[in-house]
Amino acid sequence: MPESTTPAYITSLIRHFEDLRDGTHGGSVSRRDKEAHFEKAVQMLAPVARQVLTEMNMSLLLGSAQLTETGLRRTADGGLNASWALSWPEQRAAGVELIVLQAYFGGSFHHPHLRGTTVHDWPLNVFSDEDAAAQLSILRAIASSDLHNLVYRADYRIVPAVTASSGTQLANGAKTT
């Protein structure tokens, strides 16, 4: 399959498997260089993560959520992480976790990953703005899966778009039933 027609998720998996094969990440061998790649990846990924969570907030949570982000920080195991999270009234009342998109590079990890609150471990291979933008569908899938799993931990009432009056117009012009 030519590179130009290869879907982003396949490219990401190929990079991941090649890194495992070669003992590298983005061409880097040392932890220090890999962390430098990770720091840049977080900077490029931040606007994409914010876009995904803003879409969910506006379309599903009816603008009721608060978006927070941590920025890059060192973890207890010596790794690095950054996260973007949505919290909203129904989620807090139900006592379930936030929807979280997290980029993390565990202290003993060979390379970094993406994860959600309930969805874990997708290879993070971002080395350009284009790579970051290509993660949009993956971040959407992680955030959507998190919300789906959180509904099962609580119930559908944590999603304001579902509890709004029947026939509510959604952002895309469709109506709920």
Each model region followed by its residue ranges:
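N-terminal, Lys/Arg- and Ser/Thr-rich interaction peptides
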Residues: 1-33
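Intrinsically disordered, low-complexity regulatory segments enriched in Ser/Thr/Pro
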Residues: 3, 7, 12-15, 81-138
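Generic detector of well-ordered alpha-helical segments enriched in charged/polar residues
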Residues: 11-14, 18, 39-42, 136-140, ...
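Short, flexible helical or helix-coil boundary motifs
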Residues: 17-20, 24, 52, 60, ...
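Negatively charged, low-complexity tracts enriched in Asp/Glu with abundant Ser/Thr
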Residues: 25-83, 172-176
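Feature targets compositionally biased, intrinsically disordered low-complexity regions
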Residues: 70, 77-78, 94, 105-106, ...
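Ampiphathic alpha-helical segments that act as solvent-exposed interaction surfaces
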Residues: 109-177
